[in-house]
From Swiss-Prot:
It comes from Haloarcula marismortui (strain ATCC 43049 / DSM 3752 / JCM 8966 / VKM B-1809). Keywords: Cytoplasm, Hypusine, Initiation factor, Protein biosynthesis. This is Translation initiation factor 5A. The modification Hypusine is found at residue 36. GO terms for cellular component: cytoplasm. Belongs to the eIF-5A family. Pfam families: IF5A-like_N (PF21485). The gene is eif5a. Functions by promoting the formation of the first peptide bond. It is found in: Cytoplasm. Its main location: cytoplasm. One of its GO terms (molecular function) is RNA binding. HAMAP family: eIF_5A.
Length: 126
């Protein structure tokens, strides 16, 4: 699995964290100390990278959480078919099919940037 373990206090807004076994990008991060003898707690609000669902996590700041290793890669569109595009990775020359977001218009030979975590991929910009 492409993930590593880290403490909650080392996370920042914009970084990635695993919530409910889903890679999520952190939208907001806040800490609060509950009292004189209590340990600080962190509240994280995040959005799923591949499914877009909002999730939250509340943990002590010294708790360990999994951080996914999400790779940003370059690809070239080979062909398009409705909402799907056949993309070739520019580093490994692997070819695979990806779902095209509605707000992106792709043509063959366009170069794109996409995120990849294990077997999940998402086009971020063209």
């Amino acid at each position: 699995m492409a993930r590593e373990q880290t403490e909650v206090r080392e996370l920042d807004e914009g970084s990635y964290v695993m919530i409910e076994d889903t890679p999520c990008k952190i939208n907001s991060y806040s800490t609060a100390k509950p009292g004189k003898h209590g340990s600080a707690k962190a509240r994280i609000d995040a959005k799923g990278v591949f499914d877009g669902k909002k999730r939250s996590l509340s943990q002590p700041v010294d708790a360990k959480v999994w951080v996914p290793i999400v790779n940003r890669k370059q690809g070239q569109v080979v062909s398009t078919d409705g909402n799907d595009a056949q993309v070739m990775d520019l580093d490994t020359y692997d070819t695979f099919t990806m779902r095209v977001p509605e707000d992106i218009d792709l043509q063959p030979d366009d170069e794109i940037e996409y995120l990849q975590y294990e077997e999940q991929r998402k086009i971020t910009r063209s």
